Amino acid sequence: MKHKKSGRKFSREKDQREAMLKIMLGDLLLKRKITTTLAKAKELKMIAEKIIGRTKKPESLRYLKSKLPRNIDLKTLRGIALIAAPKESGYLRVIKKGRRLSDSAPMAILEIIDEGKKTDKESDKEKA
């Protein structure tokens, strides 16, 4: 029975699924925005919220190195920690994008919310 079990399987084995999410998490932290399917974006958001929350604590460095790909350096983590500092949660946003042409899968943009930068919609509202 599937009681109190969260997470999606994505038709992959556990090690493949973890590797896929680890790579996507690294890309998200480096680029601050990725485009993927809606299901993967929602799953990655759950994982990334916990990881970004841990970047604020300097004693969590060893834990973070085990959960993140090797191409993420300390400078990147400090930049993420500065974004996460004023908040307790809600570091990420999932924006629905439409459907992919090839297989009609629902697509989404997953991005890190930066309080200093304003989105196009917010800047349009201020102009009006």
Language-model segments: residues:
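Structured, basic alpha/beta domains of bacterial-type, RNA-associated proteins
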Residues: 1-12, 16-19, 23-128
